[in-house]
């Protein structure tokens, strides 16, 4: 959690993986990780999840309720998996904004979508989830897939997402979570802390970034805690769905 102090005048700290760092340094450290992995992000996602990330994202799209003419914000949109699908759903009368705080990831996403002809109804914005640069009551749907765990002040980000949603608009948070049984949890720990860094070393020559990613998953709030955080931020009808025995959870909330 944030706001851990060693003294009354000390800067608040937050976790970066299993380490505590000053809050002012976390965004820069996370940026370094994603600058490092951006070029091979899609390849590593496929390898590390066995392609399952595509099924998880498909389920999120199905629950989004997005239709023609909608305005959608895809936060931490990265290489554009969700944006590509939403672009087809909203059609020429709708709009999708792919927002990412990381310039390298945003460039990869822009280039990838332009290469497959997705451009007319898509806008690319470098933006901080905690301080979204959009008007109040602007979007029909906001999504953040595998990005919330990297945000320093998650409560601020959730409130910012609520602000930019229209009344009745939906927030979907797709994120790694806590396995629902002990056997899966032990197997997942072994996989995350041994296999993931090894693959990072072999494919990207960067084991440390993938060690951070494994640690960041463990530090992320569990399913019930994130549900409570969304309720506290002001969302109604908050529910979540566990996938792959809780390795991933999809949370959904509605703006009143």
UniProtKB/Swiss-Prot annotation:
Keyword Transferase attached: yes
Disulfide links within the chain: none
Keyword entries, A-Z: Menaquinone biosynthesis, Methyltransferase, S-adenosyl-L-methionine, Transferase, Ubiquinone biosynthesis
InterPro entries reported in the protein's UniProt record: SAM-dependent_MTases_sf, UbiE/COQ5_MeTrFase, UbiE/COQ5_MeTrFase_CS
PROSITE patterns reported for this sequence: SAM_MT_UBIE, UBIE_1, UBIE_2
Pathway involvement of the protein, from the record: Quinol/quinone metabolism; menaquinone biosynthesis; menaquinol from 1,4-dihydroxy-2-naphthoate: step 2/2; Cofactor biosynthesis; ubiquinone biosynthesis
Descriptive protein name: Ubiquinone/menaquinone biosynthesis C-methyltransferase UbiE
Gene name in the database record: ubiE
């Amino acid at each position: 959690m944030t706001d851990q102090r060693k003294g009354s005048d000390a800067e608040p700290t937050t976790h970066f993986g299993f380490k505590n760092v000053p809050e002012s340094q976390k965004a820069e450290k996370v940026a370094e990780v994603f600058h490092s992995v951006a070029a091979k992000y899609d390849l590593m996602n496929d390898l590390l999840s066995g392609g399952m990330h595509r099924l998880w994202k498909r389920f999120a799209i199905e629950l989004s309720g997005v239709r023609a003419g909608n305005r959608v914000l895809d936060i931490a949109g990265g290489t554009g998996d969700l944006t590509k699908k939403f672009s087809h759903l909203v059609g020429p009368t709708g709009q999708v904004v792919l927002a990412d705080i990381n310039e390298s990831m945003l460039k990869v996403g822009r280039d990838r979508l332009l290469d497959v002809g997705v451009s007319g109804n898509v806008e690319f914005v470098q933006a901080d989830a905690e301080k979204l640069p959009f008007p109040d009551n602007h979007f029909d749907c906001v999504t953040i897939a595998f990005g919330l765990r990297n945000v320093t002040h998650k409560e601020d980000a959730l409130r910012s997402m609520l602000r930019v949603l229209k009344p009745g608009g939906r927030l979907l948070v797709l994120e790694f979570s806590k396995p629902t049984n002990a056997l899966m949890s032990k197997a997942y720990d072994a996989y995350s802390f041994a296999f993931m860094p090894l693959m990072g070393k072999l494919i990207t020559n960067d084991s440390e970034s993938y060690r951070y990613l494994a640690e960041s998953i463990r530090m992320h709030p569990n399913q019930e805690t994130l549900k409570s955080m969304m309720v506290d931020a002001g969302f109604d009808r908050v529910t979540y769905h566990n996938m792959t025995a809780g390795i991933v959870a999809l949370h959904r909330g509605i703006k009143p």
